[in-house]
Amino acid sequence: MAALTQNPQFKKLQTWYHEHRSDLNLRRLFEGDKDRFNHFSLNLNTNHGRILLDYSKNLVTEAVMQMLVDLAKSRGVEAARERMFNGEKINFTEDRAVLHVALRNRSNTPILVDGKDVMPEVNRVLEKMKSFCKRVRSGEWKGYSGKSITDVINIGIGGSDLGPLMVTEALKPYSAEGPRVWFVSNIDGTHIAKTLATLNPESSLFIIASKTFTTQETITNAETAKEWFLQSAKDPSAVAKHFVALSTNTTKVKEFGIDPQNMFEFWDWVGGRYSLWSAIGLSIALHVGFDNFEQLLSGAHWMDQHFRTTPLEKNAPVLLALLGIWYINFFGCETHAMLPYDQYLHRFAAYFQQGDMESNGKYITKSGTRVDHQTGPIVWGEPGTNGQHAFYQLIHQGTKMIPCDFLIPVQTQHPIRKGLHHKILLANFLAQTEALMKGKSTEEARKELQAAGKSPEDFEKLLPHKVFEGNRPTNSIVFTKLTPFILGALIAMYEHKIFVQGVIWDINSFDQWGVELGKQLAKKIEPELDGSSPVTSHDSSTNGLINFIKQEREARSQ
């Protein structure tokens, strides 16, 4: 594929941007088109509620949106989409298909990898998960002392942790009949020590989530958990009743002491950051029930169908992707804020930090050359209204343009005080996007200060600080209620957004070689931390850091 910056549609957008950038004033755009909301919004009607994508508060015109859609078409987005859904090995650096869509393929339409339909295997694992969840949640599954399971501890890292953690937090209102869930990921011993201190080994079930069963952080934490467990259980055979594996390495699983019958498989065409739909989601299913887990899958499948069949002009993931391209590659924006106005979504931005930054944080194209344009943004965010009292100042009056996605449910899970809390939350959500769009003019600020009776001295001093330029772009994503179905649809929407941007940038969104180098060096450094001899095998900084740590440890041990 030719370089993005040489693409005729890209050049057309560049020319338009340089000629018309100064004309893109959101106040004027709204004043000039009283129907702008209807022209730049999308209503997605599902059987489980509606999702509204309002992208009217973006620095775009109908001409810009059409040029962006033309760019997507010229970069082969539609063909790439079909290659993914058809099971082609689009992750070419690892020679793998990319089929998280198969994990939630509720239609059961055959999906082939190397000529073999993967759906029978997908359904077999789902049935196994369903049966296991029923036994644990009903109390039929007993621990070594005859007690039922009250706590499930998921030990994994990256995609084996972030997805299940985010979803179990988001769907807490649906967990009343399920066991509590805990997540241990960090190799820092504090994480597992603090978690184990709260647990009873007799009623704890550990899920060890590692495809290879060799991930250093996960296996170290798993061995620590097993050691803690056996201090109470004494008998190694009891491990089989309290540990299950999400893996493909039967030999290592058996060596650990886990019954292979309690090993739940997934496949090399499931990328870690897209794996919550697979057996990696076992902690989700245990916590909220398998029926709700299936609803999560169904919501994602609904979005998959929308993404696959809807024209690009009305396609939610595509529109989000194109708006991101507009800001990153033309306005020079470097970050993207995800701001969910729902406390249950407090891990949503963290989840998509991995989803987006590990996928599109690349500078090499599929042809092996360095890109000559920006790629993936820095993704960050916190729930509203907390963020308003932390970093919104910079979004409103800072020197950086930060495109934002605001998300909120119309219905709250907790209508306490006759819905007062949620009404205030909704008002803040609506006010922020309006404020970022409109700002406050010098004249408006002047009238405000006059009405407040400020002295001439205060007036002159305060006026510049009271002005808001506005013209800050936002998307508003409003949905009926945060249900398993709607959550599944929202996650899939952002997954496909990331995919579309990767296609336009001509990068492989499904490998993660950037994770490897640090791990390789850590293996070399680990034995160098033993003993007291100074280390000289690295650069002066790394040598100095290692030797400082060794000196401090030795001094404290004397």
UniProtKB/Swiss-Prot annotation:
Catalytic activity: alpha-D-glucose 6-phosphate = beta-D-fructose 6-phosphate
PTM remark: Phosphorylation at Ser-185 by CK2 has been shown to decrease enzymatic activity and may contribute to secretion by a non-classical secretory pathway.
SUPFAM superfamilies for this protein: SIS domain (SSF53697)
Pathway(s) annotated for this protein in UniProt: Carbohydrate degradation; glycolysis; D-glyceraldehyde 3-phosphate and glycerone phosphate from D-glucose: step 2/4
Biological role: In the cytoplasm, catalyzes the conversion of glucose-6-phosphate to fructose-6-phosphate, the second step in glycolysis, and the reverse reaction during gluconeogenesis. Besides it's role as a glycolytic enzyme, also acts as a secreted cytokine: acts as an angiogenic factor (AMF) that stimulates endothelial cell motility. Acts as a neurotrophic factor, neuroleukin, for spinal and sensory neurons. It is secreted by lectin-stimulated T-cells and induces immunoglobulin secretion.
Complex and partners: Homodimer in the catalytically active form, monomer in the secreted form.
Protein name per Swiss-Prot or TrEMBL: Glucose-6-phosphate isomerase
Residue numbers bearing the N6-(2-hydroxyisobutyryl)lysine modification: K34
List of catalytic residues: E358 (proton donor), H389, K519
Gene: GPI
Modified residues (N6-malonyllysine): K454
NCBIfam families: PRK00179.1
Sequence positions bearing Phosphothreonine: T109, T250
Modified residues (N6-succinyllysine): K454
Main location group: cytoplasm
Keywords: Acetylation, Cytokine, Cytoplasm, Gluconeogenesis, Glycolysis, Hydroxylation, Isomerase, Phosphoprotein, Secreted, Ubl conjugation
Modified residues (N-acetylalanine): A2
Compartments, as annotated in UniProt: Cytoplasm; Secreted
Matching InterPro entries: G6P_Isomerase, G6P_Isomerase_C, Phosphoglucose_isomerase_CS, SIS_dom_sf, SIS_PGI_1, SIS_PGI_2
